[in-house]
């Protein structure tokens, strides 16, 4: 029997992002928390000052927690505007996670003290917005404004999970941040579901005995 050679997926290198011309105020928007079984989906919108650049911006998932925490005050200080938006577990259950993420992004943009004339959204789809918008695949790696938004959203949500951990230490939220890990599944099995769990997510439904 012939052994098939291992195939490795070639990494697709995306070209550097070219900013559309003719826009003065550009906001970057990103989300954190679509995958977890518990808590809000959190988004952030950031308008950076081109005359006051921030070194070391990158996708929040690729930065250490220490680096994210170091960059956060600098982003808040140097940005022309920043805001956080969110949707609760109840809204996620009512809308579905994709629509809830879009609503949370709308809320982040609406919360900016200065409204942008262009919003760059990480991913492949945009929420309905009152200004021009463009989806940017891997935007958190290619667009500084989106990287900054990614860092804010990640730090905010992680801190909320640490607070939830204080309320429910038996679940280990500070470690797994609500994601569907083995430890989280075991905690649900042992301790049940809390009000902050997303009841529409399959593992939570299963724990509640809700049939599909």
From Swiss-Prot:
Keywords from the UniProt entry: Cytoplasm, Endonuclease, Hydrolase, Manganese, Metal-binding, Nuclease
Q: Origin, by domain of life?
A: Bacteria
Listed as disulfide-bonded, the cysteine pairs are none
Alphabetical GO biological process terms: DNA replication, removal of RNA primer; mismatch repair
* Residue ranges annotated for the RNase H type-2 domain, each copy included: 24-212
Q: Where is this gene product found?
A: Cytoplasm
Which EC numbers characterise this protein's activity in its record? 3.1.26.4
Might you report a single GO cellular component term? cytoplasm
> Which cofactors are required for activity?
Mn(2+); Mg(2+)
Summary of the function given for this chain in its UniProt record = Endonuclease that specifically degrades the RNA of RNA-DNA hybrids.
Family named by the database record? Belongs to the RNase HII family.
Its name, as the record gives it, is: Ribonuclease HII
